[in-house]
From Swiss-Prot:
Gene source species: Treponema pallidum (strain Nichols)
Subunit structure: Part of the 50S ribosomal subunit. Forms a cluster with proteins L3 and L19. In the 70S ribosome, L14 and L19 interact and together make contacts with the 16S rRNA in bridges B5 and B8. Interacts with ribosomal silencing factor RsfS, which may inhibit ribosomal subunit association.
Family assignment from sequence similarity: Belongs to the universal ribosomal protein uL14 family.
Top-level taxon: Bacteria
GO terms of biological process kind: translation
KW Cytoplasm (keyword) present: no
Function: Binds to 23S rRNA. Forms part of two intersubunit bridges in the 70S ribosome.
Record carries keyword RNA-binding: yes
Gene Ontology CC annotation, any one: cytosolic large ribosomal subunit
Keywords noted in UniProt: Ribonucleoprotein, Ribosomal protein, RNA-binding, rRNA-binding
The protein's name in its UniProt record: Large ribosomal subunit protein uL14
InterPro entries: Ribosomal_uL14, Ribosomal_uL14_bac-type, Ribosomal_uL14_CS, Ribosomal_uL14_sf
GO MF: large ribosomal subunit rRNA binding; structural constituent of ribosome
Length: 122
């Protein structure tokens, strides 16, 4: 579960390395976000040559969470870290590559571009 002030790794090559959640999109009192949810993030660490600079505000979709969550079939899954992918206004990733595994739930939430770029879907 991701909430405001949570820090996440960036799982793409957009240039951002570490981001901090500043808003969970979807309702004025929504507190938590999980896999497939869109959040607004502030870039805390970025490569100096990247288009995305430190301090910029971007939208991102969560692809991995450390907290285990229940799937529809009754199984539970968790990852080693909290990670997100920076997206544009249309929901497409800003980077051209995705690093590490991503959750299968992204396919059902119309993030097929992220799923197709990912090396492993769990």
């Amino acid at each position: 579960m991701i909430q405001v002030q949570s820090r996440l790794n960036v799982a793409d090559n957009s240039g951002a390395r570490l981001v901090q959640c500043i808003k969970v999109v979807g309702g004025s009192r929504r507190r938590y976000a999980s896999v497939g949810d869109i959040i607004v993030v502030a870039v805390k660490d970025a490569l100096p040559t990247s288009v995305i600079k430190k301090g910029s505000v971007e939208k991102a979709v969560i692809v991995r969470v450390s907290k285990e969550y229940r799937r529809v079939d009754g199984t539970y899954i968790r990852f080693d870290d909290n990670a997100c992918v920076v997206i544009d206004a249309n929901g497409n990733p800003k980077g051209k590559r995705i690093f590490g595994p991503v959750a299968r739930e992204l396919r059902d939430m119309d993030f097929t571009k992220i799923v197709s770029l990912a090396p492993e879907v769990l």
